[in-house]
């Protein structure tokens, strides 16, 4: 199934793109998707512990089971004040 991954902020800079489409086997999780992303863009792996994941407008856990046509957003932690 096709899943679109969108990168924000520093992760977009490291990935060298704002988004990528990946073909993902059914019943895979957000954690599985991250491994696929890291295989294509190894520089993102160093951010693994702090990456926030969202599906559409909702933050999701790494155990989230992907659905066909999902748009997954990857972003670094939000900072500011």
Where are these regions (language model features)?
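Ubiquitin-like/PB1-type beta-grasp interaction modules and other compact soluble beta-rich domains
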Residues: 1-80
């Amino acid at each position: 199934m096709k899943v679109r991954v969108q990168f924000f902020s520093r992760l977009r800079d490291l990935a060298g793109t704002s988004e990528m489409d990946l073909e993902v086997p059914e019943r895979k999780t957000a954690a599985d998707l991250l491994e696929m992303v890291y295989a294509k863009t190894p520089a993102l792996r160093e951010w693994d512990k702090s990456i926030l994941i969202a599906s559409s407008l909702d933050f999701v856990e790494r155990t989230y089971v992907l659905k066909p046509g999902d748009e997954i957003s990857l972003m670094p932690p939000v900072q500011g004040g």
